[in-house]
């Protein structure tokens, strides 16, 4: 027994390399076996933490190696006293083994510690709180902190006089969001510390509107203090009458109104006289005449438009204006004749020139007055309205709308947008002018997309072109499409169909504008529709827009040469006739080939029957 538990001397150093190899090979299995046997009695014995274990023989005998002599005596005495030395040795060995593992870290741990110690200690920078100051420079005492909740704010506004919805970096720019945020901070819905920056409240809008664009319903999401039950009334009292808060509703913490919005509904109000054909003898009207002579079958018959302009002409002649005067005014749109008139006026005396200019301007005003009165009294026919509805239906589905926005190439995948539905209402009369309402329900929209869609559809109807021409604007050819006036555009409301399911599961109310229908309709009639009607009757915005298109000749440089930044809208419209002819010729060739191929296929069958 003494030999078995004897302490190894320096003579055993020669066997050390062999011991290390066996130690690496069998150490783990032996220790796990010992732990299983001695686990119930480990707590009954204590042993010094300085013991090391070495494996000396092939039969895996374990020898504790003390660092001090006292520890050796204790161990040998235990082994000589009774017959339980085996259990004691095994238990103490296991105890020491576990303690040795804890006290001797792995080489990788030591390396990590060294690297950590090499790094210089960098204390955390202490950020001092800078209190807000008033106008006199005195610090404003910090208000007690109140709980904030993530909410969805449903609102409506008239965009007249505002530079769009989104707040700008320049504080002097008037925006819808700036007025709303200031009113919320004043009403106590936003703390003074967070009132200086929208990002601190997690501010986000569901849809961004441009300058002059209205919204009957829109949603913003942010963290607000909503303890006060009268918070909506307080905010509305601080806002101008053309901005209203419909409701404030609790949402989940991760709610983002822009990302959670599944689709959006826009409305565009258009006077029906915008769908009338171009003015006779205008630039666009003459181009249509040329193409009708080349392809009479392409353009649809528009006897209604011809009769309407003849009626206007008869009213002008009845007012005392002669046909020569009408022709002179119409030809004044021609650049060459304008130059001739300028040369003639320069040769004439100043007095005569002033008299002629005055009479000419009076004549133009008189003719425009008669034309405007005729436009106001125009009532659209069912066939023209149906044509416009069919053109608007061409936008439904997923298409590449790169031609209906700015700065989007055809290969940009973000130009692909999904239009869910388009609805054109029945005509209605407001203050003597007939209007139609166009609602476009889409998943998302790009900059100027709706205004370009309306302008393109109106041009197709005005020129009596087929509905299928719209599909060619989704191709790779870059086309310059004009924008319809922003006056008639408004956001009806964003839709949260998908997110409302999640809200109802979390015991929250869905985001729905139908419960505010009465208030929203009253607001639209008073602050949106009436302003649109009044501004159109006063400024003649739609009449000026389509009149400009009828007389448009293209941009020119200093030398008078046309500038081509992509194909012109009219070039594409009239090149469509050539494409139709090419497709017709291809179809005719294909049909002729199929007819010729049929008898060729039947000849082998006849020959086979003859042979049989």
Curated annotation (Swiss-Prot):
Chief subcellular location: nucleus
Q: Where in the cell is it found?
A: Nucleus
- Coiled-coil stretches: none
Q: Where is the composition biased (Low complexity)?
A: 83-97, 336-347
What is the top-level taxon of the source organism?
Eukaryota
Q: Which GO terms describe its biological process?
A: mRNA processing; mRNA pseudouridine synthesis; tRNA pseudouridine synthesis
Protein keywords = Isomerase, Metal-binding, mRNA processing, Nucleus, tRNA processing, Zinc
| UniProt-annotated stretches for the region Disordered | 1-21, 64-122, 330-352, 583-612
Quickly give the catalysed reaction: a uridine in tRNA = a pseudouridine in tRNA; uridine in snRNA = pseudouridine in snRNA; a uridine in mRNA = a pseudouridine in mRNA
UniProt lists compositionally biased (Polar residues) regions at 64-82
Biased region (Basic and acidic residues) positions are 111-122
A single GO molecular function, which one?
metal ion binding
Any binding details for the cofactor? Binds 1 zinc ion per subunit.
Which InterPro entries does the UniProt record give?
Answer: PsdUridine_synth_cat_dom_sf, PsdUridine_synth_TruA, PsdUridine_synth_TruA_a/b_dom, PsdUridine_synth_TruA_C, PUS1/PUS2-like, TruA/RsuA/RluB/E/F_N
Cite the EC number. Answer: 5.4.99.-
| Cofactor(s) needed for function | Zn(2+)
Q: Which CDD domains match?
A: PseudoU_synth_PUS1_PUS2
Show the Pfam families listed in the entry: PseudoU_synth_1 (PF01416)
Alphabetical GO CC annotations of the entry are: nucleus
What does the record give as the active site? 210
Record-stated family: Belongs to the tRNA pseudouridine synthase TruA family.
* Function per UniProt: Formation of pseudouridine at positions 27 and 28 in the anticodon stem and loop of transfer RNAs; at positions 34 and 36 of intron-containing precursor tRNA(Ile) and at position 35 in the intron-containing tRNA(Tyr). Catalyzes pseudouridylation at position 44 in U2 snRNA. Also catalyzes pseudouridylation of mRNAs.
What PANTHER family does its record include? PSEUDOURIDYLATE SYNTHASE, PSEUDOURIDYLATE SYNTHASE 1 HOMOLOG
- What protein name applies here? tRNA pseudouridine synthase 1
User: Which organism is this protein's natural source?
Assistant: Candida albicans (strain SC5314 / ATCC MYA-2876)
> In the record, what lineage is assigned to the organism producing the protein?
Eukaryota, Fungi, Dikarya, Ascomycota, Saccharomycotina
The record's gene field reads PUS1
